[in-house]
């Protein structure tokens, strides 16, 4: 039986297909015969610290349950010393490729790069993947390609109509789908991104403009790859990422020779060592929220010293801290002390089911004050009250109506649509449920500690 989430009943034989978050939250996992982790380089925290900590937690949890494991990843130079001995495994490095890659430099006058790209798209034959630095750049390229659209491109007109009706007709993706140009970046809903990949592989979309999201585990049938930018956002990519991008050209049994057109010099040839925080436990790359999940005998001496203050304190049990995966112990304890010292605050958080406005605002203010430490806007949100407003708006307003309301205030439809989608991806689908349940558990722990059962909350429904 295929199991993708914890609500499914298990059979005698099961295949689990889980995201790292679902793997961490999955209760009572049975013994596992074989655990496979694809793209294991994401264990390294240098690109995305928060997601890497979650993946390390999932890796640790599953290795405890699995008889065997198999980690896969491209272009890896080595793994940390001692890792094979600790986990009883062997690292095998290979340069084998199923297709031949032709690297073709592209010269463009300064300021005329986009014009040269459009000319190149007229010159190439076959399905063409275009890599660029950001969603904004992707939209710009899609728009220009759509303006130069050929009547020979089949496109996906029915999909374009549906997207226009449910999101907004002026979103660049709509123009692209009509003109045979797909788009793929991290702000898009996964279903729409997969729709574009499907249309590209079926030949309905001869061009697919993407950011770095497409190189992470998405299979395409591209004869050509055009590497237009040498950056991801504002940071220059390394040789590892460059290799991953150019590796999207060609496809075994489909295109045996892949053409890679590059607008910039390739980076210096240096492949990475993958850091694995759950093993190294380096203070600079391993969060305390990860360390607190490890069994004591798996902790290094320096890690035990880091965790000692949390085991000595009495305001919040280690069990509660561990249940709140991904939330730093010091932040949880700070909130626990705050609630214990201000009983009136507990009353504002003591609700069950659906909150009213004042309860929702109290929760969002608490989340923002204690758990959010990133500077500036986070997923389109700038404060606790802003978060509460946007969640309340989502509860009572269809997505298309939300977009229309924002556009009436003035603004670019592309930016408004994608900012709204980024909010949904970051908050309702990821951060908010996890952080809200963290507040709920801490609130209940303090209410019980103060012998106030009437102030116990229940946010799950």
List each language-model region with its residue ranges.
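C-terminal accessory/interaction regions of large nucleic acid-associated machines
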Residues: 301-461
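Conserved C-terminal RecA-like helicase domain
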Residues: 1-15, 24-27, 108-117, 122-209, ...
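SF2 helicase catalytic motif II
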Residues: 20-23, 27-68
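Interdomain hinge/linker at the junction between the two RecA-like core domains of SF2 helicases
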Residues: 78-123
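A short beta-strand element within the Helicase C-terminal
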Residues: 31-36, 207-231, 258-263
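Structural recognition of the conserved hydrophobic beta-strand(s) that form the central parallel beta-sheet
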Residues: 16-19, 36, 67-74, 207-210
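Residues immediately C-terminal
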Residues: 42-46, 216, 251
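Conserved segment of the helicase C-terminal RecA-like domain
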Residues: 61-77, 224, 231-278
